[in-house]
Amino acid sequence: MMNRIITANLAFLASSLMLAQVQAAEPVYPDQVKWAGLGTGVCASGYRPLTRDEAMSIKGNLVSRMGQWQITGLADRWVIMGPGYNGEIKQGTAGETWCYPNSPVSGEIPTLSDWNIPAGDEVDVQWRLVHDNDYFIKPVSYLAHYLGYAWVGGNHSPYVGEDMDVTRVGDGWLIKGNNDGGCSGYRCGEKSSIKVSNFSYTLEPDSFSHGQVTESGKQLVKTITANATNYTDLPQQVVVTLKYDKATNWSKTDTYSLSEKVTTKNKFQWPLVGETELAIEIAASQSWASQKGGSTTETVSVEARPTVPPHSSLPVRVALYKSNISYPYEFKAEVNYDLTMKGFLRWGGNAWYTHPDNRPTWEHTLLLGPFRGQGEQHPLPVDKRYIPGEVKWWDWNWTISEYGLSTMQNNLGRVLRPIRSAVTGDFYAESQFAGDIEIGQPQTRSAKAAQLRSASAEEVALTSVDLDSEALANEGFGNVSLTIVPVQ
């Protein structure tokens, strides 16, 4: 009986969870809610009445758009009442309705293709960025204008983002409307400014490319020789092992000083090019220019398993090589920066979340770029505008209602367009490696030699070994050893 009760409870819980998933709430974007005066619960084609729960989720926004004693209908004979009624939602009827699209658009910011700035020194890259009218000056100027900053333009043009002066200020740049020649309008001499500063650059490991490769091929350094000797009356299978520390030496030179400001976000392996064996790891969170080269070492072993006839020896030979490679390289680097807008906000409409009407002078900084402000709120969280209190600082619902969703999507997409420059230079590496162990034809030992060795406890041994450890170390082969053991 108890098992049946437990089973029934589990089934009820599972069905409840499934129902909760089916009925999960969807975001309601206030800027897409429209007022319709077509009668109780009547909306235009493509729209439906807003439900009570949906109205509750954006109640503050709806009430702020209503008259003091206004009453507007919702679905299923619910109404929401204006500020004079403290925004009460209750059962009732009204001759007008809050309506919502059947297919709402969330309004995600589009991701535009990267803007690639040619390689150069840091000041060259910055200059190209802040002086580009179409890709930078106009988008950021229009953003400031849409947010409510006054006079984002110069005296010689009636349009936003035109006739703008760009000047170097400290480690950044100031973009501001030209104030020469006089102007007309309230406080028109107080132009809003846009400062671009605190640049940083982050390497993109996956963006690696290279030019023509010059590779030496393998060059013989030394040949190690020995004999694998069997002193017994029976054939012996042996293991001949060459063991050594393999070194790889590498270096790079950088074409432009921008590399001094570029950092790597995560450690990564230098890409393999050609046939030169490399195992190079670039450390994280360091200046790219500071990593000029280095050496890596790994222990390598090569073995062979020949069978040596009785009272015979097999010639053993292994060749040691080195090779080098060089080529020009290029990585892309993401550009990150601070964008600071400063000026007074328009009385006739601004997007600050309190919508002040006393024309306050306001300064606000956005952290732009894929590696700026990681872990913090997105600097332009338009897609979270349906959550009251989540969208800090700016009222994106207001900007969308004022200028249109597509206009704001287009502008914010251009402001957030990824900006990249290039880090270029030349790469060189040298690596050492061993070939396979070669085994020659057996050689029968003389009777005299066998008699001299008969008293030895060793059954197999390496004889006539030609291996100069010191000379090999100078060539990059460390701790070289050649050993032989019988197979057990």
Swiss-Prot record:
Propeptide: 444-488
Disulfide bond sites: 43-99, 183-188
InterPro entries: Aerolysin-like_C, Aerolysin/haemolysin_CS, Aerolysn, APT_dom, APT_N_sf, CTDL_fold
GO terms for biological process, alphabetical: killing of cells of another organism
Gene Ontology terms, MF aspect: toxin activity
PROSITE patterns named among the record's database cross-references: AEROLYSIN
Presence of keyword Secreted: yes
Superkingdom: Bacteria
Site (Important for oligomerization): 156
Residue span of region Part of the transmembrane beta-barrel after proteolytic activation of the toxin and insertion into the host membrane: 256-288
Cellular component per GO, a single term: membrane
Keywords: Cytolysis, Disulfide bond, Hemolysis, Host cell membrane, Host membrane, Membrane, Secreted, Signal, Toxin, Transmembrane, Transmembrane beta strand, Virulence
Protein's cellular compartments: Secreted; Host cell membrane
Pfam family, one: APT
Post-translational modification: Proteolytic cleavage and subsequent release of the propeptide trigger a major conformation change, leading to the formation of a heptameric pre-pore that then inserts into the host membrane.
Region annotated Interaction with host N-linked glycan, chain positions: 69-85
SMART domains: Aerolysin
Coiled coil, from the record: none
Gene3D superfamilies in the cross-refs: Aerolysin/Pertussis toxin (APT), N-terminal domain (3.10.40.10), Proaerolysin, chain A, domain 2 (3.30.412.10), Proaerolysin, chain A, domain 3 (2.170.15.10)
Site (Important for heptamerization): 390
Record's subunit section: Homodimer in solution; homoheptamer in the host membrane. After binding to GPI-anchored proteins in target membranes and proteolytic removal of the C-terminal propeptide, the protein assembles into a heptameric pre-pore complex. A further conformation change leads to insertion into the host membrane.
Recorded family membership: Belongs to the aerolysin family.
Role description: Secreted, cytolytic toxin that forms pores in host membranes after proteolytic removal of a C-terminal propeptide, leading to destruction of the membrane permeability barrier and cell death. The pores are formed by transmembrane beta-strands and are approximately 3 nm in diameter.
UniProt remark on domains: The C-terminal propeptide is required for normal protein folding and secretion; it maintains the aerolysin precursor in its soluble form and prevents premature heptamerization and pore formation.
Protein's name in the database: Aerolysin
